[in-house]
């Protein structure tokens, strides 16, 4: 039977519940425990697919095509298991399911209420999401005290009552603010947060106290006394410069031992040697690489969370420190490409809407004409095709029908039909709903023999995750190829364009993909496409007049992906 660890948060949002949950899962996994994670989001949206990145941050896409919370990306990066649509659900999904049941008459004419119907549905979703895991770590989104979180908190309270005592554990993450004028950490917000949680009927077994400095012993004792939590279970969640240090930080304070004791789990000792090697590689780079990430959501970098982490992973596996410069594409439209001077590589990520598109195209033109390594992802590939069509293939005014429906050269057009991972035919039109109607999830791609893409992946067939409505218009591929652009990967079956590249006689490293490789990058394994991108940037930096990217005069020997972390 599955045992449950429930993770809640108090005082303020964005304290890092997802990182804490993922770190605990990583430690338990090294102890031989089969673990999974769930994220419960209290908002009424069915999923975050149509939410603004400025409000929600990144939308993480799972292998089975679910648009989910960005915390699922952290989960996949910290443990070996893959998340599915069952690992993330929202208030919207719960109410939608209950209302459908009511319409079918499943409640036999009874009055449908939050308790028991909504809470029962939440418990059902938790059990289904846990699957056959030994331990399911369940993160409750939001903050204790939020009205929308109450049904979720009531549901997990009921589970603690209904299950044996040793089958549940509650972890509460709070903030210990430091008041400069007083010169001390303040515990009162934590006391009140736990008080509010206890009023709901939940007594935390562990407190994770987020702070920017050490927690004095007397303050720890004070927190334990006033929250009814054992002193050894009051654990400091110290601010660190890398999230990949958190597993060791929590393990050193015996969090995993406390949880295993509460859940009555017998497990081998934790082995965090891989995580320690990873952190060592992160802290001992041999070069610095400057990457320009040109996007429209740069004011909230959480919008590109998986992407920034994938670049960090590539840095780990190439012994490079990655400095990411977030560049607003609209600023390029206004002020030109001067902000890209000194960059070792340029990356244009995915995005939606017309705003900032021409600035991204200008950045791509700058990368191509100056032979700077370029990686385009999703929209970044589509705009690379548009730039090449305009400036090399003689199609002046070429555009995407997403932004310019009347363009004379619609080199990017709506994907009308394709087959899902399960082989089901999917058909879309311009009038289709926005939510959940894109080409989503893992899709098989065939790599062209002799292409740079095939050399990078070392395979003729890959599966990568997608999230898009528009695609390269096959009608214009012959003209693009005649001008010099190569279609280096296509989808299995439909022959949709999946990757483009330029011959290395024209450009040393110019690669773009319709899919999102960042969703499958992990710190332990990295990702071949990002590693190759960073290696290309390192070569460019070495050839630059100043070579300012070098940490030492002795250039390290290049190595293959994954050589440093076993």
From Swiss-Prot:
PROSITE patterns: GATASE_TYPE_1 (PS51273)
Residue positions binding CTP: 13, 146-148, 186-191, 222
Annotated ATP binding sites: 14-19, 71
Gene3D superfamilies, sorted: 3.40.50.880, P-loop containing nucleotide triphosphate hydrolases
Region entry Disordered, spans: 545-566
Cellular-component GO terms for this entry: cytosol
Top-level taxon of origin: Bacteria
Regulation: Allosterically activated by GTP, when glutamine is the substrate; GTP has no effect on the reaction when ammonia is the substrate. The allosteric effector GTP functions by stabilizing the protein conformation that binds the tetrahedral intermediate(s) formed during glutamine hydrolysis. Inhibited by the product CTP, via allosteric rather than competitive inhibition.
Subunit structure, as described in the record: Homotetramer.
Family named by the database record: Belongs to the CTP synthase family.
UniProt protein name: CTP synthase
Source organism of this protein record: Nitrosospira multiformis (strain ATCC 25196 / NCIMB 11849 / C 71)
Lineage, highest ranks first: Bacteria, Pseudomonadati, Pseudomonadota, Betaproteobacteria, Nitrosomonadales
């Amino acid at each position: 039977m599955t045992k449950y660890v429930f993770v809640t948060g108090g005082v303020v949002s964005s304290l890092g519940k997802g990182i804490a949950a993922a770190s605990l899962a990583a430690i338990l996994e090294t102890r031989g425990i089969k673990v999974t994670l769930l994220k419960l989001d209290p908002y009424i949206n069915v999923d975050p697919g149509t939410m603004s990145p400025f409000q929600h941050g990144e939308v993480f896409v799972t292998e089975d095509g679910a648009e989910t919370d960005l915390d699922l990306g952290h989960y996949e990066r910290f443990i070996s298991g893959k998340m599915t649509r069952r690992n993330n659900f929202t208030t919207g999904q719960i109410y939608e399911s209950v209302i459908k049941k009511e319409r079918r008459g499943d409640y036999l004419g009874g009055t449908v209420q939050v308790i028991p119907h909504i809470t029962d549905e939440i418990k059902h979703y938790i059990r289904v999401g846990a699957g056959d895991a030994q331990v399911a770590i369940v993160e409750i989104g939001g903050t204790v005290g939020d009205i929308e979180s109450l049904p979720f908190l009531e549901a997990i309270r009921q589970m603690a009552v209904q299950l044996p005592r040793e089958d549940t554990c509650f972890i509460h993450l709070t903030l210990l603010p430091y008041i400069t004028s007083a010169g001390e950490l303040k515990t009162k917000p934590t006391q009140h947060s736990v008080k509010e949680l206890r009023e709901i009927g939940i007594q935390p077994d562990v407190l994770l106290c987020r702070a920017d400095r050490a927690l004095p012993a007397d303050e720890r004792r004070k927190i334990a006394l006033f929250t009814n939590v054992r002193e050894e279970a009051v654990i400091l969640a110290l601010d660190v410069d890398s999230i990949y240090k958190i597993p060791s930080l929590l393990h050193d304070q015996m969090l995993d031992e406390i949880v295993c004791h509460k859940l009555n789990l017998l497990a081998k000792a934790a082995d965090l040697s891989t995580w320690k090697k990873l952190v060592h590689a992160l802290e001992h780079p041999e070069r610095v690489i400057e990457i320009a990430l040109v996007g429209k959501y740069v004011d909230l970098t959480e919008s590109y969370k998986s992407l920034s982490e994938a670049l960090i992973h590539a840095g780990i596996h190439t012994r490079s420190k990655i400095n990411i410069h977030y560049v607003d594409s609209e600023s390029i439209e206004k002020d030109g490409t001067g902000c890209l001077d000194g960059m070792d590589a340029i990356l244009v990520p995915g995005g939606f809407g017309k705003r900032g598109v021409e600035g991204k195209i200008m950045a791509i033109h700058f990368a191509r004409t100056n032979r700077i390594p370029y990686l385009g992802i999703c929209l970044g590939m589509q705009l690379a095709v548009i730039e090449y069509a305009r400036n090399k293939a003689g199609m002046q005014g070429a555009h995407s029908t997403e932004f310019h429906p009347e363009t004379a050269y619609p080199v990017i057009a709506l994907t009308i039909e394709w087959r899902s991972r399960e082989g089901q035919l999917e058909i879309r039109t311009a009038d289709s709903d926005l939510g959940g109607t894109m080409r989503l999830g893992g899709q098989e791609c065939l790599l062209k023999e002799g292409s740079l893409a095939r050399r990078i992946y070392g395979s003729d067939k890959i599966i990568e995750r997608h999230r898009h409505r528009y695609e390269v218009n096959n009608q214009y591929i012959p003209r693009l190829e005649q001008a010099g652009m190569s279609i280096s990967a296509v989808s299995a079956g439909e022959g949709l364009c999946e990757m483009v590249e330029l011959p290395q006689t024209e450009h040393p490293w110019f690669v773009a993909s319709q899919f999102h490789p960042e969703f499958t990058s992990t710190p332990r394994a990295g990702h071949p496409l990002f590693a190759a991108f960073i290696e290309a940037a390192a070569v460019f930096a070495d050839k630059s007049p100043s070579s300012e990217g070098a940490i030492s005069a002795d250039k390290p020997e290049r190595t293959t992906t994954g050589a440093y972390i076993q």
